[in-house]
Design a protein with these regions (language model features):
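A short beta-sheet element
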Residues: 134-173, 335, 360-362, 371-413
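A structural connector/turn signal
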Residues: 119-120, 147, 191, 359-360, ...
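Short, surface-exposed loop/turn microsegments at beta-strand edges and helix-strand junctions
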Residues: 85-93, 102-105, 109-111, 123-125, ...
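Non-catalytic DNA-recognition/assembly elements of restriction-modification systems
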Residues: 1-82, 210-320, 451-490
Length: 490
């Protein structure tokens, strides 16, 4: 009896492992201390930023400053500010925001009227230009390739051109590196910059690497963006094949059955038998019926996402307490805003140990899957490339598990305006829009009469994703060269 008492048993105590982290330090001049109110707390000074500046200044190749007369930059500017007059799609020019700058294939959400008092030519992006955000989340980097060329971006984006073409990809890679990001978003004293101006680039040091290293890095970035452009062209080709096969008109040209066409708001009748338990008008919009009727006319079969031929499951992770860790101990944690980026900018990493089961079951991104928001801005669909596999998604995202033979085709259809409309019809909620897996299962999907065309669409989407994966690997290779052969080279 006594021996069975837990109080008398030896209990093996697990000694916690203490992570051995290097001490963060830097030297601070007396003038810096006085300038910051004579405060001596380390938090007042960004130690990592000061170390980043010192690392670059002391690199083996010496430095140049980006924007001086002897620097790399030819011109850095942003258009003048103007009052934006927004309008509908058919009456304006597609207008992109800084948050879309890093998307693999940005799609415009806003359109500005042609009567807006601004120079559209000045707002249009020119090829071979480096882009920097100057306010909000400063320091975001992008490169104008074929996809972004001639698009109209806001005045919140700084446009940078270079004297030598080789310096464009080289500077892009440096500023995107962890050291470059620290330097771009702070000054030499380690103070965080809240607003970036072109003049600030004059003070930024960059390693003066040999031309052959610059050329290697620049070529990798050029090839990376070429592959992104090619992937976008494949998506466009697949979409056009789908539109042609189903004889789909522009979504604005569908004839809808409005009750009173002259009414100031859209009005329509709904039969009691068609309510389906939904009394919200958005579920019964006539455009939805018009799209479905058109698909039934031209498709071989109209089924739903929940069809076992289309998907094996639709997963929405449950709410959970997140355990964040350093990069080396976790997996990337993606929210909705990072999904369209090739190299997501998230700095959050979920613990591999604490979330092992969840990563395996519901949080980890699976092959041949599609991702779509379950809360917030609904209707968008993402086809995650290979390097996303195994990363974690938030509990505000749903994962559609599909098959290699159909997942690309499924993405192409859902990525169209027609697919987005069919998803959004299931929206519910008051303050925050929401949608559930059961709703996604009911979204209509057409199967084509011509199976060869359907396979070609699927193959184009898969090939596009493969090109995006290769583009990601090339950029990572350029970043590795920058770190190992330039910044930290002995």
């Amino acid at each position: 009896m006594v021996n069975s008492n837990l109080a008398y048993q030896d209990i093996e105590i697990e000694i916690p492992q203490i992570k051995d982290e290097p001490v963060k330090w830097c030297s601070v001049s007396l003038s810096d201390v006085i300038a910051r109110g004579k405060r001596l707390e380390a938090s007042v000074f960004d130690v990592e930023a000061k170390q980043a500046w010192q690392t670059v200044i002391n690199n083996r190749f010496g430095i140049k400053y980006l924007g001086t007369s002897n620097g790399l930059i030819d011109n850095a500017y942003y258009p003048g500010r103007f009052k934006r007059i927004y309008c509908s799609k058919g009456n304006g020019v597609a207008f992109y925001l800084p948050s879309q700058m890093t998307d693999v294939y940005p799609k415009p959400d806003k359109y500005i009227s042609k009567i807006t008092k601004c120079s559209l030519d000045e707002l249009r992006l020119k090829a071979q230009t480096l882009l920097l955000t100057r306010s909000g989340t400063i320091g975001t980097i992008s490169y104008v390739s074929k996809t972004l060329e001639n698009t109209v971006f806001s005045d919140d984006v700084i446009r940078v051109t270079f004297k030598d073409a080789v310096d464009l990809g080289y500077t892009y890679t440096f500023l995107k590196s962890s050291i470059g990001q620290k330097i771009l978003t702070t000054n030499g004293y380690g103070s965080v910059i809240t607003h970036l101006e072109p003049e600030h680039l004059n003070e930024i040091p960059i390693p003066n690497a040999p031309t052959d290293i610059k050329q290697r890095i620049n070529n990798l970035i050029i090839d990376s963006y070429r592959l992104r452009d090619e992937s976008n062209e494949l998506i466009d080709s697949a979409t056009q094949l789908l539109v042609d096969e189903l004889h789909l008109p522009d979504i604005s040209e569908f004839e809808v059955d409005d009750y009173k066409k002259e009414a100031p708001v859209e009005t329509f009748n709904v039969k009691l038998s068609d309510l389906n338990g939904r009394a919200d008008a958005s579920y019964h919009l006539p455009i939805v019926d018009a799209i479905i009727n058109h698909l039934r006319k031209y498709a071989e079969e109209v089924t739903t996402v929940g069809d076992e031929r289309i998907s094996s499951d639709i997963i929405l992770p449950g709410r959970f307490k997140r355990v964040y860790v350093d990069k080396e101990y976790g997996v990337r944690f993606l929210g909705g805003k990072e999904l369209n980026q090739l190299d997501p900018s998230t700095e959050k990493y979920l613990s591999k140990k604490a979330h092992a089961n969840q990563l395996k079951d519901s949080l980890g991104i699976k092959p041949n899957s599609l991702l779509t928001p379950a809360r917030g801005s609904l209707g968008e669909v993402v086809f995650p490339p290979k390097h996303f596999i195994g990363w974690a998604i938030s509990d505000n995202l749903m994962q559609i598990l599909s098959f290699d033979s159909i997942c690309g085709y499924l993405y192409i259809f859902l990525n169209t305006e027609y697919g987005k409309t069919l998803i959004q019809r299931f929206t519910y909620g008051g303050v925050v829009d929401a949608i559930e897996p059961e709703h996604i299962k009911q979204v209509v999907i057409p199967l084509l009469k011509n199976e060869d065309v359907q396979k070609q669409i699927n193959d184009f989407a898969l090939e596009a994703n493969q090109k995006r994966y290769k583009a990601y690997k090339l950029e990572q290779q350029a970043l590795d060269i920058m770190d190992n052969e330039v910044i930290f080279a002995k």
